[in-house]
Amino acid sequence: MNINRNRLVSNLIFISILVFFDQWSKYLVVTYVRLGTEYLSFFGDLFKIIHVRNTGVLFSLGSNIDSSLKNLFFLIIPIIILVFVFSFSLKENNKVSRFALILILSGGIGNIIDRLFRPLGVVDFLDVKFFGIFGLQRWPTFNFADSYVVVGMIVFIIYDLFTKDKSTNL
């Protein structure tokens, strides 16, 4: 595989910056906010910083499954997927797609670091009021790594939907 050295270096730098910011924010929360407590509230209760842990995945799904299965589904499989995403990002020529892939990769790495080194689970701390949308008064608490993954997926999907080759008529 012919890898563009500049692309590799720029990807690694960008990933490192995003992962550092995610881990630094989690470090601050773990250091200064007692687990299970609210630290700050902005605009009434629209946005809160609260320290919680998540031993599952999105919306705490899988929190109650056996720990050996958690290692398989929440560590091993995601690491394999991230290796493929990284190799794909190196081959991707489109800057928007590469940006989206790097966001997804950075978020995945940030949460895998928590799974490996934080026995209480992934640190979540961003809490947003959701005004009853989808039956939720508050969106499930999340972190910057989660945001990277979601924004990366949205960018990737929107870009893919609106830049498909329009010359193909079905």
Swiss-Prot record:
It is a multi-pass membrane protein. Pathway: Protein modification; lipoprotein biosynthesis (signal peptide cleavage). The chain crosses the membrane at residues 13-33, 72-92, 96-113, 116-136, 142-162. It catalyses: Release of signal peptides from bacterial membrane prolipoproteins. Hydrolyzes -Xaa-Yaa-Zaa-|-(S,diacylglyceryl)Cys-, in which Xaa is hydrophobic (preferably Leu), and Yaa (Ala or Ser) and Zaa (Gly or Ala) have small, neutral side chains. GO terms for biological process: proteolysis. The active site is at residues 124, 146. HAMAP family: LspA. Belongs to the peptidase A8 family. This is Lipoprotein signal peptidase. It comes from Borrelia duttonii (strain Ly).
